Amino acid sequence: MKFTRSAKFALAAAASAALAVSLLAPAQAATRSTIVIHDTNALTSFNSGQPDTNLTINGKVGNLTGIGFYYINDKKNVVRNTTFGDFKIVKNGSTDFRIAYTVNKGLVWSDGTPINAVDLLMSHVLSSNAYSKSAGLGDPDGDDTPAFDSNGYGGTYSDNIVGQPVLSADKMTLTLQFKQRIANWDLYGPGPSPVHTLVLLAEGKKGLQSVKDNEAARDRFFAAYNSKNTAVLKSIGKVWSEAYDITEVNNSTNPLLWVGNGGFTVDSAVTKSSVTLKTNPKYNSGPKLTGTIDTVIFKFISDGTAAAQALANGELDVYSGQPTADAVAALKKLSNVNLIGGINACYEHWDTRVNAAPGQPDYNGIFKGHGGKGADLRKAFLLSIPREEINEKLIKPINPNAPILGSTFIAPGFDGYERLVANNGSGFYVGSQDALNAKAARLLKKHYPSASPSNPVKVTVLVPGNNPRRAAQFALAKANALKVGFDLVGDVQASWSPKIQLSTYDAQFFAYCPSAVTQAGSNANFQVGGGNNRNGINLPALDAILNKLQLPMDNRTFISTIIQAERIIFAEGLTSGVFLHPAVTAVNKNLKGIKPSPLSDDVVWNWWEWGY
């Protein structure tokens, strides 16, 4: 089961708990049709499309269980999946832009039900603010959570879609109309969802049904969708938003949850330990399985050194995570693996709260409000984060060339980056740490004249738990911030991602991992209604600038637009990028086909090629 949605960022989370290496079953003892993949993070849900479950590991599992019109390869290129279907522009007007998506005939879900374009309509339900409101499912921009707790609302799709998608007479083609040409239009189309299973689950069914019954259930979904039957749609929304938020799977788990069209289906899961997937025998929606793998096991180990030892013991086939320097040193000593390095697109950053997130109680902390005192104190706080020291001590031992980030929109090396950082206001946060501390102290004392290391101002920080690198990062930040006059009080939470939105916290730090490369990819972090705007940012001038990124433009215009946006972001002290995550993947020498991607899918984007 995979629910696709508009291109977004996923969060790189910390594992819920470390797994003792002694509990791992040796990979080498398994048949060579099994691949055991390490991940730092423990799975929290089988639906990564919700704000609180938008984590990289959840998305990785989903990647194996569903596939649509395209995938993104290790070069960050969009590759069309013509086995599933085709899509093309059918009207290219400046105020009437239409794309038709056609599903190939003969494709089936893992329960044997034929796939058609009705299965694409869930994407609209999950992404259109207008549909949610008109169907009585709630306002995604309001304080109350809508019936579908989707992270896909807001942004390019919702802002530009016109009316409802149009279904062809044979129900194999869906045509979308946008009010203008949009940038990266090929990434904002619909993906398939097994809507019949959502209906059956909402109706209380406990097992797989006949194809005839499944098609009748899909017809009921289509009828409810067309008529905007609020009661039926809300019952489906409850299933979509809650039923997949499980971490334990066994023989008693309802098999309707695992219907998908990917190469693998979920077989079992052990909370904070592992997820096992088996080959989908009815898979015919994508590239043929050319390898020898019929079982995929994700093992969750937060300690990089322990994971390296597990790899050495043959208990893992693929190591991929957030390594410490010690873990990398251990990996380099292994003779039975190939080590693949590089730079990941995931970026570490510190964020500050401005106001309450939707549905949360008022925020009355130190950073409250745009402009004035709130902005001064946010900037002072971000100046006190010792980015250079963090980079030198935690990242450069792994990647000696690791840069400090001057933008959270594009990375160093991107065409125009130097022009961007020279003009976007990031220079305010650059200099020796002593100079930055002095600047921070001046801003702090402007509002708290008595603030000092012996009389510090408290800042409550959400700290991702069970991650040694994050613990070390917070310790460095806490020590330096105290020199300025801030007392960073860390609340360490293993399951931290749902807590980002809480008004309890003045600041958080974690990583965003893009699932695709789009012009408007960072908009959701800062715009009103954006799926990742959980710090109460509400700046109409910034929203207007970010909206321009939805339109096709040349590189120079793109950079100029980001400059305008980041000048506001840095002047308000909303975020500060620290480093790009170093990419370290270690692979069993006998395993072929592992080609790590810098995007959030990492090693799992090409599962059909894996084999021994």
Regions found by a protein language model. Give the residues of each.
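N-terminal lobe/hinge region of extracytoplasmic solute-binding protein
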Residues: H38-G93
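Alpha-helix-centered segments that form part of catalytic cores
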Residues: K234-A269
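Long beta-strand-rich cores associated with HINT superfamily self-processing modules
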Residues: V587-Y612
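Extracytoplasmic/periplasmic ligand-capture domains
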Residues: K2-F3, D74, Y101-A135, P255-W258, ...
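Surface-exposed binding/hinge segments that line
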Residues: P140-S241
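Short amphipathic beta-strand and strand-loop transition segments with alternating hydrophobic
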Residues: T82-N92, V162-L167, V266, V584, ...
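Secretory targeting and sorting signals
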Residues: M1-A29
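Short, hydrophobic/aromatic-enriched beta-strand segments in well-ordered soluble domains
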Residues: T34-D39, Y101-K105, M172-I182, T276-P281, ...
